[in-house]
């Protein structure tokens, strides 16, 4: 919705008030999931807690107790993609999880759910992501890409259903 609202505004077709929010959703009472529960997820979760207490997590590399101590219900990837309203992809890349988020999982997502890719792009099969985001009503935002910088003729640049940022997260001087 943010992407389309931006385009509408530029083209003098913006909507205001309730009309502009008809297809929007609130975080309140949503199911929010983390794929990868490292430092980033641990910092992000407290910011989301005022909106919901329904958190799911998938991180097979961490002890179950750590996830449970952080009030996350442990779920399989299939269950996370079926149940979640918002999914944060925050995992590191390994030989075992390259392209693990593929068309099978993406097709399980609820209509109007959100997928936010903020860690390593190669955890997601971007070819599948482009196809699915065109066909299904899911919201996608990504700050990372399989190849950076993204080539000028890359098909991802033509996607109207994905919100992009050029790997800005974490790139600050300290």
Which residue stretches match the model-derived regions?
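Short, well-ordered alpha-helix to beta-strand connector turns
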Residues: 30, 52, 84, 112-113, ...
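Proline-glycine-enriched beta-turn/loop adjacent to the NAD(P) cofactor-binding site
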Residues: 38, 143, 169
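Adenosine-phosphate binding glycine-rich loop
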Residues: 146, 150-152, 157-174
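Rossmann-like adenosine-cofactor binding region
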Residues: 62-155
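Glycine-rich adenosine-cofactor-binding loop
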Residues: 20, 25-49
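Phosphate-binding beta-alpha-beta segment of Rossmann-like dinucleotide-binding domains, i.e.
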Residues: 1-31
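Oxidoreductase and adenylate-handling cofactor-binding alpha/beta cores
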Residues: 1-7, 46-53
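Conserved beta-strand positions in the Rossmann-like core of class I SAM-dependent methyltransferases
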Residues: 56
């Amino acid at each position: 919705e943010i992407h389309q609202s931006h385009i509408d505004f530029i083209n003098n077709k913006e909507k205001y008030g309730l009309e502009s929010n008809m297809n929007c959703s609130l975080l309140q009472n949503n199911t929010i999931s983390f794929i990868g529960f490292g430092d980033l997820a641990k910092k992000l979760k407290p910011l989301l807690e005022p909106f919901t207490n329904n958190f799911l997590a998938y991180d097979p590399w961490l002890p179950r107790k750590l996830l449970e101590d952080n009030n996350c219900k442990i779920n399989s990837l299939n269950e996370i993609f079926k149940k979640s309203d918002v999914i944060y992809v925050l995992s590191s890349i390994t030989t075992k999880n390259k392209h693990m988020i593929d068309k099978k999982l993406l097709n399980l997502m609820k209509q109007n759910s959100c997928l936010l890719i903020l860690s390593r792009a190669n955890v997601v099969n971007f070819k599948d992501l482009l196809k699915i985001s065109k066909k299904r009503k899911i919201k996608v935002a990504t700050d990372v890409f399989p190849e950076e910088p993204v080539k000028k003729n890359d098909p991802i640049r033509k996607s109207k259903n994905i919100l992009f940022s050029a790997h800005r997260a974490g790139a600050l001087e300290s």
